[in-house]
Amino acid sequence: MKDAEDALPARIPIFPLSGVLLLPDAKLPLNIFEPRYLDMVRDAMAGDRVIGMIQPRPKTSPGLARSPSLLAEVEKPAVYGIGGAGRITAFEETKDNRFEITLTGLSRFAIIEELAVTTRYRQVMADWDRFAGDRWAEEEATGVDRSRLLTALRAYLELARIPAEWETIAKAETSSLITSLAMICPFGPSEKQALLEAHDLFERSRIMTALVEMSLLHRASGGGEDDDDDGDHRIH
């Protein structure tokens, strides 16, 4: 990932997907079935294979009338200014004409501007300079309180009834563990965005620990399941 062949393009397609983030070196499997994103993957495969994952911003309170502006927001939602880009490193076309792909994280990016395009999918000009360290430096886990994080995580997963392979977790490098948890744990979009935008591994670990501990307090006080936890999750 650190070689010159991984130079990143100024113009990239974006795939808005709530609750999903892609961090450098991480693997993100995706099931592509919507026509515009099938187009996006075909075009990416014919080019540099780079796709930018980005979250839609939380919707404003909907009005009673479905105005043209609201309809446009559904079709083309406002997105956060920062996302994570990856390169397609695995591709398979299924018998029912879906694409099953894997993105390997390259770098975060900031949107300079969204382009007026004729493609059905959206494209942006990306600024990579702000996150140059994503590509050229190996992050160290200096200062990370791994013990505190894992203690809170174990209680959180048991309470949420999320299975975890603790033997694998115990052996994982701290940097890989934090990256995996940030991507897999069922936090809400704003919390996921905070994890994505964290300056470094230490800051991301502090945010992760705080989120897990706050969720524990919420559940322990009778708050029940988190509103955004509506999927099947496994930590490994």
Q: Language model features by range: what are they?
A:
Residues 1-165, 190, 201-204, 210-236:
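Positively charged
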Residues 147, 175-179, 206:
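Non-catalytic, well-ordered alpha-helical scaffold segments
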Residues 169-187:
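Core structural elements
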